[in-house]
Amino acid sequence: MMKFRFRRQGADPQREKLKQELFAFNKTVEHGFPNQPSALAFDPELRIMAIGTRSGAVKIYGAPGVEFTGLHRDAATVTQMHFLTGQGRLLSLLDDSSLHLWEIVHHNGCAHLEEALSFQLPSRPGFDGASAPLSLTRVTVVLLVAASDIAALGTEGSSVFFLDVTTLTLLEGQTLAPGEVLRSVPDDYRCGKALGPVESLQGHLRDPTKILIGYSRGLLVIWNQASQCVDHIFLGNQQLESLCWGRDSSTVVSSHSDGSYAVWSVDAGSFPTLQPTVATTPYGPFPCKAINKILWRNCESGGHFIIFSGGMPRASYGDRHCVSVLRAETLVTLDFTSRIIDFFTVHSTRPEDEFDDPQALAVLLEEELVVLDLQTPGWPAVPAPYLAPLHSSAITCSAHVASVPAKLWARIVSAGEQQSPQPVSSALSWPITGGRNLAQEPSQRGLLLTGHEDGTVRFWDASGVALRPLYKLSTAGLFQTDCEHADSLAQAAEDDWPPFRKVGCFDPYSDDPRLGVQKVALCKYTAQMVVAGTAGQVLVLELSDVPVEQAVSVAIIDLLQDREGFTWKGHERLSPRTGPLPWPAGFQPRVLVQCLPPAAVTAVTLHTEWSLVAFGTSHGFGLFDYQRKSPVLARCTLHPNDSLAMEGPLSRVKSLKKSLRQSFRRIRKSRVSGKKRAANASSKLQEANAQLAEQACPHDVEMTPVQRRIEPRSADDSLSGVVRCLYFADTFLRDGAHHGPTMWAGTNSGSVFAYALEVPAAAVGGEKRPEQAVEAVLGKEVQLMHRAPVVAIAVLDGRGRPLPEPYEASRDLAQAPDMQGGHAVLIASEEQFKVFTLPKVSAKTKFKLTAHEGCRVRKVALATFASVACEDYAETCLACLTNLGDVHVFSVPGLRPQVHYSCIRKEDISGIASCVFTRHGQGFYLISPSEFERFSLSARNITEPLCSLDINWPRDATQASYRIRESPKLSQANGTPSILLAPQSLDGSPDPAHSMGPDTPEPPEAALSPMSIDSATSADTTLDTTGDVTVEDVKDFLGSSEESEKNLRNLAEDEAHACAILIK
């Protein structure tokens, strides 16, 4: 009979079809700023911008929501990019001197980016392929000749090659060799020296046949491509960095390595030109750094703009990253906090226009993109609708809030608009507006909250493709730090010369690492939130539309409860400011709760309907009533051997003494493992469990090699008292007839504490509850036998659905939970998921995820998956991410595996740690310090770029035949989006679900019938726990007096045998 129990049932076609309608894995879009940018391009006709990166990625941006992404086959650095103006084509140059042609093509009404052709410059004539010096043919600069499909390639060997862009083939007979240029140079200038590499190629605005060529030695040449001759020569002597034509083409501007720039007059009467008309060193006379790039733009109102990067005094400000903007007598030195990659101006490019009249200056930095309005006095920055630097301060935590009410959304946006730090606001709209966003307006608004190292919390609009900044909350003003001193120094520096002006928001330095935000929780119905930090600070805030000046109440909770033998060796707590403090419109602090010891907060949860906030650290957890501003509960979870928990966050290395002690313990344990131990009640119970396991798993049934037993962990493991999760629920804890508020806490050692709360009920129709004190009584204490850290806890109602959020049911925003049937609690540990019935806490279902060696649960969330085939059908499932980077989806409460996907590379530890799931089957994780990858597990709820671009060039069959491949998405470099469906029959029949009405804001959850772990339908579970019998120690502190006496009597006889539950 046991053989039939382990036989796998066949897949149910109906269920497999339903799973395909519910689940689908897609990596959809990358939010944030590209990591390690290396090149920049702009198409003034289509108004689109391209950014290349060191990893070989190409990203094109237009209007908000218009994005295209491509990835070169070789992970080489993109050094230059150039648009074929108005054609939707882009030419990229890599550091291996290969050229690649990209095209924006349309399929089914939407556009995407494809690589069409690639080209490698052949070896220098006269050399064979093996002996040719690579430096001679290394491409240093690329120019796309206007009004033609020709590209000029400048090389390190001083040659200029010409290329047919449509086919990426060399044009024979048109190569400009250095010898031909040297014949036009006076003998005294040559002096037997080479010209040097080609540093710059610039096209003539009105005459495309004329090309300005600059060599590194300083020689400037105007080459006429039509007549194949030199039109003009400028005999420069300074090492050249960059070139620029004047608008009327009568002047040429050059910048040099000594921090100077020169203006040359193109006078046909003087050949060659020996001296420039103007030569100046803006920040001289002392030695200066090179001016890497210079732009000259004239204005109809008179005068001209001179914009250049670099040129700072080498000794004083050689480490600054600056772009200088000079017009008439006005000079502004834009001081950035990261390296300058490139910049361009948005100006008129029509040949018939007489003036440039620049509107904006776009500067691409290593860590952000800054756009300045050149038409408004003061040249203020233009707010960016995307490409905001997520990592302006290092991201320390993140959270997602789905279905934000419109009223709260408007209040947050209004508060953010009042935060403009600039004295003058820009009247210029975002200048990069190309393409059309075809995606529908999102029906629901989503907020992404990111906590940062500098104590700020940033609010992002995550409803669509473009991640737009909305509001920034700063908590540093509540505490005494050294920032005032730094601000005074910065103010003093601004009065000096050069006239520095701080631009951009990237600031990687934090005034105090204790300000770092560790946990964030927001109630979208009451506009209240909690922010918890690195030094044990827990801040409760409330949204206000007007600025106020008020003092903040401070409460201190000692989690150790004066326990002896523990001494905190970490950092001190932050000192709060006293007295009334000014607070701008936005989230304003209501009360500050300080945990002692001041360790980093590891878990937090907020229940606004009860006005309670719970928080946990590595020492214990606390409960605080922020309405009465009084503590309710403090519980220490430290084990006597948890000495490492007192070291603080900076002491992560075990001491040599402790490491040696544990090593000798392991050696002794291995030597005596074969000896017979003294029999006691606990060992007898374990032996009985082992016998049951052997009986349940006959020897003729072969176990899968990757499966293993879950080994129980030692109770004295370091940091076993860390609180991993906290949870509020209105459920049955005392008995099956009376439900009430409860609080649940899970720790690193597999302990779960459940408290019954006495919360005064609010009056009918009232928002606030009475002022009576809240009481907390320990109801249950569950110790998981395998002692794996508890990652998440959730209570399921009688229909198997998770309980709604605070105020959702009372305000008719979600269906009320079923309080008639039996509730259950889902406890997710790092090794397995278990469902217990309430209030008896007896085993109902479980799933052992660690049957795969080395697999651990890292992130868990309950999500709603709507069907693409039927709008009225949805299921609530459990989504989890493992340390291997795999995402698994399970049914609830049956814990049946539905699908699993490979999402993140297992080596990407930071990406796995940063993952956040949404309530509707999507997720975010960091692929770099500045970028979130967005993915979707839902077949219906997908956020991806859907856009088009109006292109003005014909697409004939010849050009289409050159297309070699579609570019892979950059996101695939960080995990293969393969889809693996569970092969076995999972639920027999589709799970029932109630309908989704149009007036229901939140999608409904599936009402799944509870399954017993011994039922016949559970026999097809692939990763069953048979043979891995564990015992949970459950202590009930709310039973009847007779049961309590019995428990105490049993506890006195044998503590390990008390209230034991056997789970098979």
From Swiss-Prot:
Localization annotation: Early endosome membrane; Golgi apparatus, trans-Golgi network membrane; Golgi apparatus membrane; Cell projection, Axon
Disordered: annotated segments: 966-1010
Modification after translation, per record: Phosphorylated at least at Ser-663 by PRKCI.
Gene Ontology cellular-component terms listed: adherens junction; axon; cortical actin cytoskeleton; cytoplasm; cytoskeleton; early endosome membrane; Golgi cis cisterna; Golgi membrane
A biological-process GO annotation: establishment or maintenance of epithelial cell apical/basal polarity
Keyword entries, A-Z: Cell projection, Cytoplasm, Cytoskeleton, Endosome, Exocytosis, Golgi apparatus, Membrane, Phosphoprotein, Repeat, WD repeat
Residues bearing PTM Phosphothreonine: T958
Entry similarity comment: Belongs to the WD repeat L(2)GL family.
Additional observations: Down-regulation of LLGL1 is associated with the progression of colorectal cancer and melanoma. Located within the Smith-Magenis syndrome region on chromosome 17; deleted in patients with this syndrome.
Protein name (record): Lethal(2) giant larvae protein homolog 1
